[in-house]
């Protein structure tokens, strides 16, 4: 999409075999960087955010759906982060969350794309952030069943120790699966490391 739809000149795609990560030392943060924190199918994930410099020129755009509530995220390194608030805790993926850093908001308010943005995707009007969407205003009415389900799940999250508790649970589950796989010679992880 970056090359074919957005036609961003000089785009670099770090292509590696399934289950591997590219060499993160080669990522050019003079440009914007788009990445997935944790691949659901392969299990490949960035180990942490240490590879993202504090003084980067570009913004980071992160799909964190399989990482939020399961991995420790360094929010100071993430400028535009998305995840489905249902899928991340076991529900269907129908509604999304967008978290923007001040740097991302500044870019939205100062950059004018060369093409029209459909109204449903616009986040600025007259070079100012449309902040209502971040205060609970919605474009469409979300399913109240989904909202109630999520509130229920958040109560469960709170009961197991909150965000830290879900990360601990994810790490414990990984340890159990790793121990089991290490005992069976015909099984292995799709992810190399």
Pin down the residues of each PLM region.
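Active-site C-terminal subdomain of aminotransferase-like
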Residues: 86-171, 175
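Conserved small-domain helix->loop->beta segment predominantly found in fold-type I
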Residues: 157, 164-166, 176-193
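Conserved active-site segment immediately N-terminal to the catalytic lysine
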Residues: 61, 75-86, 96
């Amino acid at each position: 999409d970056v090359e074919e739809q957005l036609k961003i000149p000089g785009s670099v795609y770090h292509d590696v075999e399934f289950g591997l990560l590219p060499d993160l030392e080669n990522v050019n943060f003079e440009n914007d960087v788009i990445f997935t924190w944790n691949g659901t199918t392969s299990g490949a994930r960035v180990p942490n955010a240490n590879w993202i410099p504090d003084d980067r020129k570009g913004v980071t755009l992160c799909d964190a759906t399989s990482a939020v509530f399961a991995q420790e995220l360094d929010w100071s390194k993430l400028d535009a982060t998305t995840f489905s608030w249902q899928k991340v805790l076991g529900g269907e993926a129908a509604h999304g969350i967008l978290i923007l850093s001040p740097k991302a908001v500044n870019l939205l308010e100062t950059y004018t794309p060369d093409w029209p943005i459909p109204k449903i995707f616009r986040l600025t009007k007259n070079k100012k952030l449309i902040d209502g969407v971040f205060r609970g205003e919605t474009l469409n009415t979300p399913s109240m069943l989904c909202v109630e389900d999520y509130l229920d799940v958040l109560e469960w999250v709170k009961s197991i120790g909150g965000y830290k508790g879900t990360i601990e649970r994810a790490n414990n589950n990984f340890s159990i699966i790793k121990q089991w796989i290490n005992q069976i010679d015909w099984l292995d992880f799709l992810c190399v490391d």
